[in-house]
Amino acid sequence: MEEGEKRLKQEDCNEDKIGTGILTLTNRRLAFDKTQSRIMDFSKRFGDTVVDVPLNDVSKVWKEGRLIKKVCFTNKTKESEQTYKFGVFNTKDWLKNIENAIEENRNQ
């Protein structure tokens, strides 16, 4: 993390296209680190950071699903838009925290 960056929320979750990993919300960005785990000894290793989106680049945040609930966001890049869907435990809380972090980041 960069200087002045604070971790607001972090959770082990699954992204629809990328797979399992850890979703992290800071006061500046959303990041998703891929993980690898082994069942034999219950170990888990961090892999590469595959999603690293500044909060200024997040154009839309929403939640979806009835049985399998997901928190989703769309990232604007110069070329296109990318949508990510994360299966987290408490989608309502994640949605509120992401929206608040985006608002606070814009007000700085």
Locations of regions flagged by a protein language model:
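Short acidic, Gly/Pro-enriched loop/turn segments at secondary-structure junctions
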Residues: 37-42, 57-74
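Anionic N-terminal interaction surfaces
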Residues: 1-28, 33-35, 45-50, 65, ...
